[in-house]
């Protein structure tokens, strides 16, 4: 899961001011299913699922956004050789208040073209979040120590700070019923 570039997007004479869109892979949707209220889940790279509140800001009815092409806008003085183009595939319900996933959209990016051994490609890691499900019997503290020591052995990552937060602590603030549900 990685944050967007910090640029505006445009569509149909609308300027979408610095949207909080995140690139995710198909496993994100399986681990963190979103409640789809219009359209479908992203099926192809650069398909995007917008939050209902974001769609309402720019379209009269949220479902009117479906099929729209959102193009990354290059600010004056910047050059982007391949601006991101996203196609709206669906509208998701806004996340509950106790969720740490309060983003305005998730777009599919299953690209396997990245050369992760090239240190220049790691410059974007500061805005990247990786979510893991540990196998049964793996202790969080043991896994954390092993992962952190392994990451810091890589020369290209010596100056990068990592933190590992258990999802149940990061993602949920349990209410009295101690459960989480979209319904």
Identify the residue ranges that each predicted region occupies:
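Mid-to-C-terminal secondary-structure elements
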Residues: 5-7, 22-37, 50-182
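Glycine-rich loop motifs involved in handling phospho/adenylate chemistry
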Residues: 41-44
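His/Cys-centered metal/cofactor-coordination and adjacent catalytic loops
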Residues: 47
């Amino acid at each position: 899961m990685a944050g967007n570039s910090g640029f505006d997007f445009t569509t149909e004479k609308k300027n979408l001011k610095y949207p909080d869109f995140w690139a995710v892979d198909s496993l994100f949707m399986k681990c963190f299913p979103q409640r789809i209220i219009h359209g479908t889940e992203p099926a192809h790279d650069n398909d995007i699922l917008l939050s209902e509140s974001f769609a309402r800001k720019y379209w009269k009815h949220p479902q009117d956004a479906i099929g729209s092409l959102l193009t990354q806008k290059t600010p004056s003085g910047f050059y982007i050789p391949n601006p991101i183009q996203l196609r709206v595939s669906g509208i998701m319900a806004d996340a509950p208040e106790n969720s740490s996933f309060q983003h305005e959209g998730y777009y599919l990016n299953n690209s396997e073209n990245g050369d992760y051994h090239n240190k220049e490609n790691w410059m974007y890691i500061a805005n990247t979040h990786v979510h893991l499900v540990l196998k049964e019997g793996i202790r969080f503290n043991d896994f954390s120590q092993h992962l952190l020591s392994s990451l810091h052995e890589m020369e290209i990552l010596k100056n990068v700070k990592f933190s590992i937060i258990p999802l149940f602590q990061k993602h949920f603030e349990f209410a009295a019923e101690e459960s989480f549900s979209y319904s």
